[in-house]
Amino acid sequence: MAPQQNGAEVDGIHTGKIYSVSGPVVVAEDMIGVAMYELVKVGHDQLVGEVIRINGDQATIQVYEETAGVMVGDPVLRTGKPLSVELGPGLLNNIYDGIQRPLEKIAEASNSIYIPRGIATPALDRKKKWEFTPTMKVGDHIAGGDVWGTVYENSFISVHKILLPPRARGTITRIAEKGEYTVEEKILEVEFDGKKTEYPMMQTWPVRVPRPAAEKHSANQPFLVGQRVLDALFPSVQGGTVAIPGAFGCGKTVISQSVSKFSNSDVIVYVGCGERGNEMAEVLKDFPELSIEVDGRKEPIMKRTTLIANTSNMPVAAREASIYTGITVAEYFRDQGMNVAMMADSSSRWAEALREISGRLGEMPADQGFPAYLGAKLASFYERAGKVQALGSPPREGSVSIVGAVSPPGGDFSDPVTSATLGIVQVFWGLDKKLAQRKHFPSINTSVSYSKYLTILDKWYEREYPDFPRLRDRIRQLLSDSEELDQVVQLVGKSALSDPDKITLDMATLIKEDFLQQNGYSDYDQFCPIWKTEWMMKLMMGFHDEAQKAIAQGQNWNKVREATQDLQAQLKSLKFEVPSEGQEKICKKYEAIQQQMLDKFASVIDE
């Protein structure tokens, strides 16, 4: 027999009462019929919360806002729906908090730099009108995921496809004409089994449920980020998963910001999860100023970006939600047939939020106090990446790439979050504290980093840049040989080495200082296109090969090195060419250097 219901009713929905409060975790009683992960409003301020455990008529709720002032006996209002995000025109060029409340709108409404408690501002602007163009007509059959109209979003993404929710279907009985409408106006009516349903341009989707796709494809296009060391040695694919673990001050945030600024994705979702507020402020300041070229005109990068800010002083529980909010927004753009990159900075703070809530729930702690289900939670997040065939027609392919920064305490890669992440992701960009202290940025440790996508991408390289895989393998071999030689030099000194080994060491130094290092704050080096990377590899390895040939023909390396000082200076200044001058002009300069190198070595060998 069910316990007697003694709670009040508001608008026909049963309300419970608060039984206990412990930080962000609230226990409510008299909650018969509540569902797991249902959205509830807690207390008189109607704070947003989510049910995470049910025991009899008691429900445990994690509250996404500050719970100060909430008392035992306060009402808990059920909404009857899960925590969901609004998806539609207006997501781009916007900044939200972890549960998709628009921060700019809240600032305008409250005239405060703080978010008032219990504020309920819709995520998408309800007043703004969008230019809608229908792509279907009355009488057409329509199924989940079909594109039934397009909207002009902004000058960067001119076609925002309007999709039917995945579980809907039927025959169109009414569709609006071309014109301007708001996101909540019902502009489509569909009939199925005699029942008519109306749809607006926007749709809602529960954040914990992955959006369905027709089928998953294997990824085969590279995810280029404009950092030479990453594009050349450890590339990822569109739809790949990347982890960037590193101690404090190693440059994780600079790498993830440069990935979001310069990657070849169509849309960027940047989730600042439990990191410093200054970093989000920096993104907000930098992105509108930075531009990227689209069809011959410059557009600010902010127009292709959605920011989700959940800084370290915001409520802990909302950190967990922010990651899911971000990935759901990314999946929505993926379903339109776009390549989306999602940055999560940092997943360690997310895991710490899980640990805190798990501790308050009294769950059994596992390694370092993290919950036993940490690995499963991380996997369920990273597995939402990938390249898919979207639902519905017309057929379209889209992808979600996830780049997760991990901050292990003290840079210890055996930390549970790092080790769980490395078991899931396919690309590992390991940052090294020693390199960062030497001001070698990006501080990627080439001996521990890896990418499992190299063989998948070989077909693309064969088609576009045939020499690339060979040059990449040779540079990796050269770097690993130089590490072994470094140990020999420490024991017996450089003079004891043979000439070919001296060349290897000198070339490795040149590659480390002038190829792997990159100044993210300069106009010539903040972004390096793949053709420039290939030419730099070609010229540096060309110098290495010519030098080895000269030694094989009896020359002395010291003499050869002195005779080719000017060539080495040119190799060191290859990176100073500004990509915006144009590929053709810069490639001609590089070809001239290549010819000069061949002539110089020919004259050195003849001496």
From Swiss-Prot:
PROSITE patterns: ATPASE_ALPHA_BETA. Keywords: ATP-binding, Hydrogen ion transport, Ion transport, Membrane, Nucleotide-binding, Translocase, Transport, Vacuole. The keyword DNA repair does not apply. It is a peripheral membrane protein. GO terms for molecular function: ATP binding; ATP hydrolysis activity; proton-transporting ATPase activity, rotational mechanism. GO terms for biological process: ATP metabolic process; intracellular arginine homeostasis; intracellular histidine homeostasis; intracellular lysine homeostasis; proton transmembrane transport; vacuolar acidification. ATP binds at residues 246-253. It catalyses: ATP + H2O + 4 H(+)(in) = ADP + phosphate + 5 H(+)(out). One of its GO terms (cellular component) is fungal-type vacuole membrane. It is an enzyme of class 7 (translocase). It is found in: Vacuole membrane. Its EC number is 7.1.2.2. The keyword Translocase applies. V-ATPase is a heteromultimeric enzyme composed of a peripheral catalytic V1 complex (components A to H) attached to an integral membrane V0 proton pore complex (components: a, c, c', c'', d, e, f and VOA1). Catalytic subunit of the V1 complex of vacuolar(H+)-ATPase (V-ATPase), a multisubunit enzyme composed of a peripheral complex (V1) that hydrolyzes ATP and a membrane integral complex (V0) that translocates protons. V-ATPase is responsible for acidifying and maintaining the pH of intracellular compartments. Belongs to the ATPase alpha/beta chains family. This is V-type proton ATPase catalytic subunit A. It comes from Neurospora crassa (strain ATCC 24698 / 74-OR23-1A / CBS 708.71 / DSM 1257 / FGSC 987).
